[in-house]
Each structure stands twice: as C-alpha cells, then as structure tokens.
Amino acid sequence: MSEKNIKGIKFGILSPDEIRKMSVTAIITPDVYDEDGTPIEGSVMDPRLGVIEPGQKCPTCGNTLGNCPGHFGHIELVRPVIHVGFVKHVYEFLKATCRRCGRVKISEDEIEKYSRIYNAIKKRWPSAARRLTEYVKKTAMKAQVCPHCGEKQFKIKLEKPYNFYEERKEGVAKLTPSDIRERLEKVPESDVEILGYDPTTSRPEWMILTVLPVPPITIRPSIMIESGIRAEDDLTHKLVDIVRINERLKESIDAGAPQLIIEDLWDLLQYHVATYFDNEIPGLPPSKHRSGRPLRTLAQRLKGKEGRFRGNLSGKRVDFSSRTVISPDPNISIDEVGVPEIIARTLTVPERITPWNIEKLRQFVINGPDKWPGANYVIRPDGRRIDLRYVKDRKELASTLAPGYVVERHLTDGDVVLFNRQPSLHRISMMAHRVRVLKGLTFRLNLLVCPPYNADFDGDEMNLHVPQSEEAIAEAKEIMLVHKNIITPRYGGPIIGAAQDYISGAYLLTVKTTLLTKEEAQQILGVADVKIDLGEPAILAPREYYTGKQVVSAFLPKDFNFHGQANVSSGPRLCKNEDCPHDSYVVIKNGILLEGVFDKKAIGNQQPESILHWLIKEYSDEYGKWLMDNLFRVFIRFVELQGFTMRLEDVSLGDDVKKEIYNEIDRAKVEVDNLIQKYKNGELEPIPGRTLEESLENYILDTLDKLRSTAGDIASKYLDPFNFAYVMARTGARGSVLNITQMAAMLGQQSVRGERIKRGYMTRTLPHFKPYDISPEARGFIYSSFRTGLKPTELFFHAAGGREGLVDTAVRTSQSGYMQRRLINALSDLRAEYDGTVRSLYGEVIQVAYGDDGVFPMYSAHGKTVDVNRIFERVVGWKT
C-alpha cells in the first residue's frame, strides 16, 4: 500500500449515481423483521448493510463485528424532495438563473469576464473569489429579464422551511421539487462555477433528492432492552417512515389516486426526509417517538454539547479518573491532594518491576485489591493480565514476580495525579498534585489553591486523573505541579496566596500591639514543619515578650528588602512613607519586618508586586511553596488561638451616631426636594448634552451617593479598629467597608441597568407611592440598614436590584463560554516559534513578536520585561 500525504479535504454533494454506486442494496420494504426475528432482506436492517452481532460475518465484506465498517444502501424516491440543508442555496439558484433557459441572468460578456477573474484568483485568494461570486449572485438576482433568451422573470418566494412559490401573472403557483429540479438541470457548468460552486462535486440539481442514501447498520445498531425486546435506533425509525410513505406514494400513483392525495403523500415524504436530516427545523413540528420524545436524527447527532464534534472528538470520556466532593484541609501541602482510600484502592498506576522495587511490589500483590496499599492486576511479560480478585494464593504469585512484570498498584502517597475543576476556563484549571491518601470520602484541597480552580467548598466536585506512563508523569512533574504555577500566565502575579482567615491571622499577628510569650510563640510555631530560631525577645522586662513581627521575620530570607503600603493604608490610616504611626506602611530590611502589617497587599492571592510575589520571583517557586506550607499555617494557628468572630454588636451603632446619620439623611432629603422643585419651576440648569430629566436624575444620584458615603464615613469613624468585621474589611480578608456601611448605616440607592428604579406601574414604581413621585424613596433609595431591617417597599426594591445581578451572571456565563470556544477553535493551531514569532500551522506569521513585546507574563515582572526600580532597590537599597 502506497503512502500519501493528505493535502486537504473537499466537501461536495453526493450525486444520485454516486449514491447508487456506493449502495449494496435498494431498500424497498418497510417491514424490518420476519416472524422469527430475522432481519428481512431489502429492509432498513438488511444484513448486507453491516454486522452488529458478535460472531456473525458480514455477507458483503466477509468481516466480523470489529472489522466490518458497514455498508450503505439506498432508497429510490418515487418523487424528488428538497434537501432541507440546501434550501438557501436552491433559493439563490432559482433567483439568480433564468426560469426558461437556466442561464445566470447577466450578459455573456460579463460571464466571460467574471469567469476569467474567478479562475485566476480562486486558488490564491479564496476569500476574494467568494466576494466575487456573491457580487455576481446579487447582480443576477436583480435582473427582471433574461439577457440570453429574453424571458420575463417572476418573483420567487420561499415560505420556510422548504416551500417555493412563483408570483406569475395568473396568480401565485407552488413550485414542486420536480419543477425546481428541472430548472436546475438546465444551468450550464460554467454558470454553476461563476455562482461559487464546483460543478464536478456540487451540481445544483443534486440538492433535490431523487435517491436517498441509507446509512450502515453499524451507525444505528438496535439494542436489546431488559425485557428482551429489541429497540431500534432513532435513525432506523425515521428510515422506516420514509420507506413506508414512499411505498404508499408509489401505490397511489400506480392506482391513479386523486392529485390531492398524491400531493399530501408527497408533502409527507418531504416532511419525513427533512426531519431525517434535521429534527429541529424552525416552523416544522419535530418527528416524535411513540412515547412523545423527539427523535434524535442526523443533525442532532452532530451539533451541540453532546454531539459528535464536541461530545466525542473535542471531549472524550476517559479511564483512570474519579470525581467526588472537595473539602478544605489547611494541613496538607499546597501541591498535595487528599485522596479517599476507596478511590486509592480503585485507581491504579502501572509500575514495572525492577531489582530495586521488587520487594515493595511483592508486598502490594500479597495485600491484593482490598487492602491498601495493594494491587489490582499483574501483567506478565507475554501481555497476559492476572486479576488479583480471583487469585487464591497471592503469596505464591508474588514469589514468581520478576523484572519485566508490570504491577497495577494502588495509588500511594507521593504519586503524581492531575486535578481539575470544571469549567476549565484557563490552563491552570488543571494542575498536578501529589497524592496523600486519607480517611473519608472527599478530596482534600489546601485552601490557598482555590483561586486557580475558582473552587469553594459549598458542594463543589472535582476530577482526578491518574497518568499511566512514565513520560506523562515526568511531564506533569516538570510543568504542571502546583508550585510551578503559583505565578499566573495571565498577569504575571501570584494567583495562589492568602485569603480570608490567612489574611486576618497575618494582620493580627503582625500588628504592633501583638506580644507573645515564649510558650505562645512556640505553640503557634509548632505547626510549621521547620526549626525556627526567634533570637532575642524584643521585650526583656518586666517579662520576656516576642513581637508577632519577629515570628514572621524568622521565615524571611536574610537578604530580602521591601517597602510599600499595606491594604489598611487608607482613609484616616493612610501612610505613604516609613514615618507611619498607624503601622500601615510595610518596611522589611535584611529579612526583618520592621514596620507595617501583613495583609492582602502583602500576601494576598492575585496581588501582583506584593511581598509574596517578590519572594517567589526572587527566591524560586519552591521557596514560595515552603513559605505557604509553613508561615501561612502559623497565621491560621494564631487566628485559631486568638479567636476571631463577628457578632451583631459589631455592626450596631450608638444613638449619637445614628442621630448624626439621620441629620445627614434629612439634609440630603431637603437637597433632593430643592432639586425637584427647581426642575418643576424650570430653574434647573441642564448638564451639557443631557435633557432636563436626565440632568435631574444625575443631580439626585450624586446627592444620594454622597449621602451613602457620608453615612459610611460616620459609621467607620465610630467603629473600633479591632472590631473583627472592620478588620476583615480593612485588611482585604473579606468584604469591604461598603458592606459594613450597608449593615450598620444604610443600603443606599438600588439600581437596575445603572439607573434608579423607574419601571413598575403606569405612573409609579409601587402602589405605595403617589403617581409621578420621583422622590428617593419612590425610586429605590433605601435609608434603612440590614441591622435595623428593611421596610416592605425597601425589600421589594432591594430584590429588584438583586434580581438584575442574577440575570446578568447567567447571561454573561453563556456568552463568555461561547466566545471562549470560538477563540479556542480559532487560535488552537497558533504557536510561538523559537524565533519569537507567532505562526499558524502553515508557517504564516501572525505576530512578529509574541504579544508584540516578546514577553511571557508568567516569567515577567507583572507584565514588564524588567522592573528596574526593584533591581536598583535590591542592589543599592532605597533612599529614606
């Protein structure tokens, strides 16, 4: 057999002759089985169409089930029918060609000119050739008289899905598929080509079917259901319908039945052939099973998420995988995954026996499939597979093991596996972890690794895949392990880092008021898997105390320097240099934390140019992993010992504070009333480019926004800096000052589509307000807080604002998913070459430099090639 290189694939339309040639039999009978249950010859289950039973031989090719590819049959249609997939093309042909002579409705000179141009450009510039054919079609469709035979043209109408009508002088006439085929047969090959079709593979009359191909049985096998009844495939049901109606139509024509009956049967045949190709045609009732379920026909097999392309080619089901709920575990390493023992006993890794591992593997074989760590199978050098469930004496089998055997052993601690959470929106939605077999039934995941997976623990499930070859394991270790992906390729910052309790703990530990006795320091350092020397206590008398800053400094490299603002540096605690009384400017010199606190800006996830980022960048991702596995555990331990909780009193304000807020509310109400009065009196000054109504809305919104922020500032001013709700908001651990404002002071304006709520009843939002009322309360402003509780009208407006968020999320998800899929398909063949260019599969240059600057964000300094300031600081320090 000679080898050939595939240059390309060309799609065309099957001609009636080709359909007959590739067919092994004509399908003529609607009955499928005889009384004995044997398939009838000439039926849609004719044995010559392929083998679906094990052990049988195909009468056509002589092969058995595994090797018989299946063979086509054909149905000779009594009357032609339109192929529903080509209706648009048929419509174009009918409008662009003459009804009498079949020529394209442009002059001979133009045909010659356009043909010459088309043939010159079609190979080199296919898109230009397509534009030319579109122009020819549009020009030809406009012609009212044929330039070749002088015939006057009538208007053609398409009534979807497949009925064509011609508006003649005497009235509207329906064009039957026979009429259409007759017209299309007249179109010469040169004219077919100028309309953008290849006449050798796609003649227009082939779009009107006279012969229907019957697919092999192998793609529509019948299945035996529990009761022993044979259930046929949906395609088989559809083909039986087509054969039955075709036979009835033939009998009616032969018997000389009235034209009305023949036309009804012809329409029915057209319907069955159309729904055979696509059972979701708009305007056509779907063909249904006896149970009422719509049949899954050819188009449904191909399109959509479960279809052939996305369901079986782009994505496949795999072996050696498992799925269960995930639970948090801060005590395992960031690149470990806790695997339930039941899963570890089910999933296996093939390990080849060598002189160095033979004793270990013998013990695994003796343990067998039910005791972990054991083994499920042994594969002998001759390829024979031994299932250990059925081996009586496993010790004897273990003694016969020798180098060359392969043992499919259970997952054990340290094995490399792939972990994934759907939807997999970016590369690091799938990373490699090392196995830690644990009790329980859920996968355990370190909390720090949630952001790349976008995981939380409210019932999320994740998938685990076990690589089966040494190459796959090596690749996973080298490029997919979690700590090698701490820096995200999206923006060159750490996507894995502290969140929530970690940040709260870090802040409480590093704040300057935190002092620890030696015993307390030892207790929190006990969770770190490393020896720590704290040095001399910071306070010696009246009692020895270590500061929280000393504890953190013990984990930092001795040559590390950093300075920058903390997250708490805002509002009254804002500091822009080292002279900071509020502990909100971070200074680290020679690995010692001298000033400032650790919060979100220092160690938080998705925080580029943070302390964590520079530590990983300058001291390796291995060091980053070590830091997260040790120092971050200390933060959690500290917050556990310290206690960290929130109570109702944390968001309760005193009477004097409430009075201050109510005064602000009254002032804002007066201001809004004045604006409305000015508007009614015609004294309001419009904003340039806005109508008077829009200007009023803007002025009111500005006033109400100021009111909410003022109320928030008043509440914040009176909150204790160690109020835990406030600590969470200021450090960036969870929530924001706005959330506290809404809980303690007021909710503020509820908006829908960025505007105050307007819609509701005819002249008002709710029946609780007067018609044409545009006051803040009537348009969705909520003066209450969550602490005091919402009034009924306020609750309604709040629900309207919340509903918009839900709808928006659902719409955005589907749109972004579809957009991403299109981008992936378009960009999947591009790659960055060694010369720095980005090229397509054919070597075409897409970008002269990758990303126009040749910088890969993952290895950059937050997208910059080099951070010069940081390098200077490392070499010469910074000016104080």
UniProtKB/Swiss-Prot annotation:
An MF annotation (GO) of this entry: DNA-directed RNA polymerase activity
Gene3D superfamilies listed in its UniProt record: 1.10.10.1950, 1.10.132.30, 2.40.40.20, 2.60.40.2940, 4.10.320.40, 6.10.250.2940, 6.20.50.80, RNA polymerase ii (3.30.1490.180)
Any one Gene Ontology BP term = DNA-templated transcription
Q: What is its main location?
A: cytoplasm
Taxonomic superkingdom: Archaea
A Pfam short name: RNA_pol_Rpb1_1
Q: Which SUPFAM superfamilies match?
A: beta and beta-prime subunits of DNA dependent RNA-polymerase (SSF64484)
**UniProt-annotated binding residues for dsDNA:** 88, 92-95, 138, 303, 305-310, 323, 422, 812-822
The protein's job, in short, is: DNA-dependent RNA polymerase (RNAP) catalyzes the transcription of DNA into RNA using the four ribonucleoside triphosphates as substrates. Forms the clamp head domain.
UniProt-recorded name of the protein: DNA-directed RNA polymerase subunit Rpo1N
Supply the source organism's classification: Archaea, Thermoproteota, Thermoprotei, Sulfolobales, Sulfolobaceae
Q: Which gene encodes it?
A: rpo1N
